[in-house]
Amino acid sequence: MKIILLGAPGAGKGTQAQFIMNKFGIPQISTGDMFRAAIKAGTELGKQAKALMDEGKLVPDELTVALVKDRIAQADCTNGFLLDGFPRTIPQADALKDSGVKIDFVLEFDVPDEVIVERMSGRRVHQASGRSYHIVYNPPKVEGKDDVTGEDLIIRADDKPETVLDRLAVYHKQTSPLIDYYQAEAKAGNTQYFRLDGTQKVEEVSQELDKILG
């Protein structure tokens, strides 16, 4: 089962990705997590990515495509995977298609911009694992602490309101065209496309996903 998640930053993709991973036993491949791991390791790619991400800009296609192709070739992706944050652009989608990767489901999470700004300013992240919480919608068991390790949670620089607005502008310009792209792919019989109302409660979205992916 090979799945792509579409939707603006903060649309709830990460939370639902956890649900899908646990339910179907496939890994989530988040370019954000891959880049954050590279940043933490202090690699050259990590340094380049950090400078761009701190400004709310996107990492260039060629860096991202190489990273993703290496990742989906690994053994844990044999039964499928979940792509979150990739592809972001039509050239990336074409590169994925050209590499012979067939996508079974494309899931779009639809949420208005103003809801996203409110959501993201309340987001807290466990840096080492990428686990994400929200002070209102999905709080940790202990305030400011990761449920699994008990380590401190942080507010990422790219979750600050002014950066969120910049990221949304970039999303609408670069990534929104993928909605049309994958709807066309679905009409051609190459994948299945579903749009979900991301303003619903987390459990309601999960139930809807369960029915779709079954």
UniProtKB/Swiss-Prot annotation:
Q: Which domain of life is it from?
A: Bacteria
Disulfide bridges in this chain: none
What is the name listed in the Swiss-Prot or TrEMBL entry for this protein?
A: Adenylate kinase
Kindly state the subunit structure of this protein: Monomer.
Q: Name one GO biological process term.
A: nucleoside diphosphate metabolic process
What does its UniProt record remark on the domains? Consists of three domains, a large central CORE domain and two small peripheral domains, NMPbind and LID, which undergo movements during catalysis. The LID domain closes over the site of phosphoryl transfer upon ATP binding. Assembling and dissambling the active center during each catalytic cycle provides an effective means to prevent ATP hydrolysis.
The annotated region (NMP) lies at 30-59
Alphabetical list of HAMAP family matching this protein = Adenylate_kinase_Adk
- Which species is this UniProt entry from? Haemophilus influenzae (strain ATCC 51907 / DSM 11121 / KW20 / Rd)
Q: Which CDD domains match?
A: ADK
Annotated segments matching region LID: 122-159
